Amino acid sequence: MYIKAEQKPQQFERKNEKLDRNKNQQLPDLETDFKGYRVNSDLYNKERDGSTEETLNSLKFLHKPQRVTQMRANRFPEEEVQRNTDLNKRIFSAGNDENVDNESGWSKIAAAKNHTSVESLNGSTRPPFKIELPPLSPKSTVPKSFQAEYPEAKSPGNDMNFEYDEEILIPFAPPVYKKSGELLKSSLKRRSKSLPTTPGIRSGNGVQARDGSPMLIRSKSVHFDQAAPVKYFAEDESPINVNKTEQHDNCLSFKHKPVNLMVDPEEETKMLSSGLETTSIDDDLTTVAPKGFAHPAKISNPNNGKGTNNTKLRKSKRFQNLLKNRTDMPPSKSNKKFVNGGGAHEISDRNSKNYHVVGLYSKNFPILSNKNPKSLKLNIFINLSQNKKVFLQELSLYIHRDNNYFSNSSSFYNIPNSHNGNDCNGVAKGYNAGCTRLIAGRILVKNIFYDKRVVVRYTWDSWRTTHEVECVYISDGDGILPGTNMDIFHFIIDDVSKVDPRGKLEFCIHYSTRNDYEREEYWDNNNGNNYKVDVVMDGFNDPFAAAA
């Protein structure tokens, strides 16, 4: 059977008619808010059959621009507004209701209302275009473990100091829809639900730490640590040295600290650790005894049985501390004798533990004489006999006082305080004012090659921070050791005034020499123990000591 291209069999035509009928039944009635225009399925049928004179054109939906004086009342029909209002009311009531089963009841009523309203608008019995909404989730529940750790907050009416969070009371707000049926998005940025929520704080049953202070609760956005790291450093220190210094952690607390201008931080920490509180009254340092103890200023007199106030006269702290250093600890005498060459052992003499004279005190290397504590002279013949290429000859302390500074009495009493001007024995601050302190030394090196470089590496804090100073050539050593082919180098340590009045100096010597073909280097570290010296700068000057 042959069929022409223009003709179609009847069975194909019947199938096309059935498909067209099904399409017409499935097409919904489209409503527009334009006056005088209504688009429905009949318009599509007429356009397809060609029986209508007017065809659907997008230009017919356009309007000329005009000034609108008042809102068009027929833009949103009353039935449509009422329908969306009822829909929002039903959603809100269902979100607050604990039983989710009521959702099916009001959805049927809302569907019936929508059906009647659409019929009144369209004038037909065809089912309207239905907006399918997702089922509402039940009210969120909090796990029991979380409830035990963070109890539920009280209502604001019962507690005046109540602080609550809106997100805790309403974890999931019900959705709100626009009049057009779209979901309304909140303009407020809510917190991520993956982060832990901050519980409500109650003043009566607050969480407290072991020391009794209220514990800091984690906030929502910004988090601060409860310990603040603090480092103390000099004004001219390098960042590398500051990074190696010790770090002090100041724990944050809610207790108010008293304002004490005359109390040192070290003394304050000692008093607080012993249970005493420091106060400052008329620039006099006094201590207040804790509860349960008698006041130290009021002592009962056994003779008359009356309490008297023992008010002591104010004395200089510098005088009291220096007097304490001379009287409290008697000089320790030792019967041990130091043998030349045995520099590996610690030296114990009458001034090893109680230095009250300004000077240098060796700890682990031999010296010829200790009559002048400001100058340490070593036995160079011992080092020369051991065929050492570099060794220390002499170490001296130089102190220069500015007479113009001390002539002015006002400047003497107004001595500036440094950040570490107080030593462990409680010496008053300001000993560095008006003084220049230097440590100078001499080094003997073997003349191997012409190019020489001698460096002294030293530290004040047990090698936590190190410093280096390069030595300067002075002359040959024929005047001291003739025929030994030695050279003399000189070095100066000029940061003595920046350390504590009783510092511990430790240093070693590095010697390198070279020519065009080879290079040699040697170390003098006192047989692997380094040179250790105690530097005392806050004691009395011995007038009988020999001039440096």
Curated annotation (Swiss-Prot):
Q: Name any one GO molecular function.
A: protein phosphatase 1 binding
Instruction: Give the CBM21 domain ranges.
Output: 419-534
List Phosphothreonine occurrences by residue: T52
A Pfam family for this UniProt protein?
CBM_21
Give the domain of life. Answer: Eukaryota
Region named Disordered: 1-54, 118-143, 191-212, 293-346
Classification via PANTHER family: GLYCOGEN-BINDING SUBUNIT 76A, PROTEIN PHOSPHATASE 1 REGULATORY SUBUNIT
Name by which UniProt lists this protein: GLC7-interacting protein 2
Native species = Saccharomyces cerevisiae (strain ATCC 204508 / S288c) (Baker's yeast)
